[in-house]
Amino acid sequence: EPWLKDQKVGVIGSGEFQVSRHINVATVQTLASFLEEPPRDATPDKKSYHLKRRDLVKRFLSSVSLLILEEAHESSGSNFYDIARLCVNADYRLALTATPFMKDSTEANMRLMAVAGRIEIKVTEKYLIDRGILAKPYFLYHKVAYKPDEVRIKAELANKHLNFRVGMSTAYQKAYQLGIVYNLGRNEAIVREALLYKQHSLNCMTLVRLKRHGQILMEMMKESGLRVDFIYGESNQSTRQAKLNSLASGEIDVLIGSTILDVGVDVPSVGAVILAGGGKAEVEMRQRVGRGLRAKKNQANVCFITDFIDISNKYLLSHSYERKHIIDTTPGFAEGVLPIDGAFDFGVLKRD
């Protein structure tokens, strides 16, 4: 910002510990590591250094008068919460989050209330979409039944289940593993959607919950001729960024991502998102939809989002409609919901 041109900004994180008098930016991970107890096997000198630094950080936090919390819903985590509690003189607090008080845990929501207070300013999705700050989303749901991936199931799950049937009353864990991860019909539908997006020159992010599901989809997409890569929990930061850059530049058609992409990652603008992982958590759902809503430049400011209605099991079916209900009841999202098993109108790419 022009008015901050000559202002010194302190940085605490990424190997830096430079504190400024007025403005400082810090990562939760770095502050939390400084506030930990020193390792038991530390030498006396290292232990003394750690304790002095911890005392310095505590005094620094107590001096803060304005606390700005980015991704404030993460304050439900102990590190984030403990750091905020140490800012005892932060009478002014600005908490920024797209998912306030939406955790399944009452305790988690109360922690956010404790460190940030009630909602004072609410900016809706519709407000941002109508002004072009977010891309206009279109949602399409496909009903899918269970078609077992017999080859992979026999090779990988032979000793895990007595049978590989999925019915309406099948227990959730088994239903999810077979009906989502090892569901050949569902995975084939995901690949078809990715191919459709490629035909319309749309880069695509496919989001899963389990690493094995991402691996299976990557194998199937490569077999179909798609250029695809996969980011998961074990991927280091430089690897993640390189793969995200490949998606942004068009080097790959599809980037598959696990829950590592839900928060804290600078995701490039994408034209399409496939929600392949099921589930029902509202925070996760909104974060994943948000991966595709970054405003587009030099192209239509829209995003196509595919999800599935899993009809093979009562738990999967219930979760499907819970996800759909979130979209149906969100102004700005609801207007773009298409009939189940309908078709996208890719003509909007030219009209918009």
Name each region found by the language model.
Residues N159-K222:
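Conserved interdomain hinge at the start of the Helicase C-terminal
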Residues R291-K324:
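Conserved segment of the helicase C-terminal RecA-like domain
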Residues S65-L66, E71-Y141, A145, I327:
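Post-DEXD/H (motif II) to motif III coupling segment of the RecA-like Helicase ATP-binding lobe
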Residues V28, V64-L67, E71-H73, L261, ...:
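Conserved Walker B
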Residues M110, V254-G257, D262-G278, E284, ...:
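A short beta-strand element within the Helicase C-terminal
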Residues N24-T27, D91-A98, V254-G257:
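Structural recognition of the conserved hydrophobic beta-strand(s) that form the central parallel beta-sheet
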Residues P2-L51, K243:
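Inter-Walker segment of RecA-like/P-loop motor cores
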Residues K8-S20, E36, N203-M205, Q215-D262:
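Conserved helicase ATPase core of P-loop NTP-dependent helicases/translocases
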